[in-house]
Amino acid sequence: MIRILHFSDLHLGTEAYGRIDPATGLSSRLADFLAAFDQVVDYALDNRVDLVLFCGDAYRSRDPGQTYQREFACRIKRLSAGKIPVFLLAGNHDLPNAVGRATSVEIFHTLEVENVTVANRPQSYRIETRKGLVQIIALPWLRRSALLSREDSKNLSFDEINQKLEDMLTQWLNSEIESLDPGLPAILAGHLSHSGAMPGSEKTMMVGRDYILLQGNIANPAFDYVALGHIHNTQTVDSPVPIVYPGSLQTIDFGDEGKEKGFYLVEIEESGDRGGEAAIL
């Protein structure tokens, strides 16, 4: 049985409803977010999970400050030092404003940090864990310009561009699914919206409309688990395959008030039988 800790949407750097500490110049909210992140790391280490899966949006800003980067890196280092594989998926807030610039999590790949895998583009991976290999098909957040040239999108409306992008991603995903080894656990990790999701506070942080994948296209029986990020409401979808948004780790704005925040611990049997335990912070 492989035990996977799934969390997303950390958004370090969110300062709403906090106050500035005059001694450090940092928002008091930073302590809240780091405390939540520490609980994730402590749980993973104390319970010796086999894989930590982060599904995007490490920071609030696409150009995070050095302090936020340091604090994020310190906690990823603890997991790495504990010999726990960490899979970091790029979200929309992890992408730079200009094409060609590095993502905010790319430094872990550049430095070849042990036990850390960074997924910046759609790709299939095989991650070695204590219990054996896990297959992950990664669908990080993608700019429209990354898949569609100006010529491709010429004279198309915004909705038509989104539809074309959705069709391309679905076609790619179906192709990758055909290459999965049915004898190994398989996970879809995505930072995206799907047609059955209930939006949350992420809507206040977006410009324009998300591209949306059909729920039926990601609820493929070839997967043991569909791990998602981007939607801040904690939610699971009733389907043959568990489709899970763990939600943001901390309250982002008043739209999150009264809602449970946390992460998921998922157990995947080699036979494909699944069971999950939600650990709410």
What does each model-identified segment do?
Residues 10-11, 49-67, 84-99, 192-211:
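Active-site neighborhood of divalent metal-dependent phosphoester/pyrophosphate hydrolases
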Residues 56-75, 90-113, 128, 200, ...:
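Metal-dependent catalytic neighborhoods of phosphoester/phosphodiester hydrolases
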